[in-house]
């Protein structure tokens, strides 16, 4: 027990990960001091980091193991394009949710719509194109099983 705070084994054994609500993946995070500038406002590039974490968590949630694909030489996702609008600022200690949804699924890429939100306020609105590449950087068809999982999410959610 930390002074005045009861801790369960769950707090140490199972890190929180995001999850799906229908077709949307929700990833929770808190703004820490390292994320902010001297005014306590989140530095603009950190929103891209938040969205990257959410995309990685979304892939894990549907059973896609990026590390295993990399180790096996199958390929990797790399961001090919980002279109982002900054609408409002997050501040130190804010609790945020990154909401991600699959917008377009192509043979060698996927477009993901991502919003960073504080409660009901949209702070950023982005569309991220992630290309699937060989280990030497050439476009490659995504594994069929992965495409099928993405399509199932778009059709029926999780």
Predicted segments, located by residue:
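A broad, structural micro-motif
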Residues: 42, 77-79, 123
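HotDog/MaoC-like acyl-thioester-processing domains
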Residues: 3-19, 23-27, 86, 91-93, ...
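Short beta-edge strand/loop motif at the mouth of beta-sheet-based domains
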Residues: 63, 68-73
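Helix-adjacent hinge/juxtasegments
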Residues: 71-101
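Catalytic strand-loop segment that frames the active site of acyl-thioester-processing enzymes
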Residues: 4-64
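Alpha-helix initiation/capping motif
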Residues: 36, 40, 75, 139-143
